[in-house]
Amino acid sequence: MEKVFERLMYASRWIMAPIYLGLSLILFALGIKFFQEIFHIIPNIFSIKEVDLVLITLSLIDITLVGGLLIMVMFSGYENFVSQLDVGENSEKLNWLGKMDAGSLKNKVAASIVAISSIHLLKVFMNAENIANDKIMWYLLIHITFVLSAFAMGYLDKITRK
């Protein structure tokens, strides 16, 4: 009975596989939004204000960072919790595949969230005249919370690895 239970529990990790695959659909949606922004800029490129262009650029960087975060979570999560990725000897293989454990993935995700939050905060600051001061304060507090959380997770990871 114990063996059956353990095999069943071990096999249940495959439930995560379609979830990781589903994240690729979100990645596809981000790609659509990215190019939608590009196509909105092109007709107005000569009339758009520099500040607006910078804000749009920051939005595109934000989308790119979220996409990178998704790829990292999809591949590392799949490799850590479901099965090893077999991409073949002759094909390109990302150098970090198979080398990122759950702890380092957590730190990379935290660093990515801080980077995404930084871009978002920069967008808020660039548009500060249109945003209430109390809202800016909340954006700043949330960002500081992300930074402190990432630092704490990194520090805890460092002391537990010793």
Swiss-Prot record:
- TM segment ranges: 15-35, 53-73, 136-156
Superkingdom of this protein's organism:
Bacteria
* Subcellular location, record wording: Cell membrane
Indicate how the chain sits in the lipid bilayer: Multi-pass membrane protein
Q: What GO CC annotations are associated with the protein? A: plasma membrane
Q: Which InterPro entries match?
A: UPF0114 (IPR005134), UPF0114_bac (IPR020761)
Q: Does the keyword Thylakoid apply?
A: no
Does the entry feature the keyword Lyase, yes or no? no
Keywords, A to Z, come to:
Cell membrane, Membrane, Transmembrane, Transmembrane helix
UniProt lists the family membership as follows: Belongs to the UPF0114 family.
- Its name, as the record gives it, is UPF0114 protein Sfri_3655
Q: Which organism is it from?
A: Shewanella frigidimarina (strain NCIMB 400)
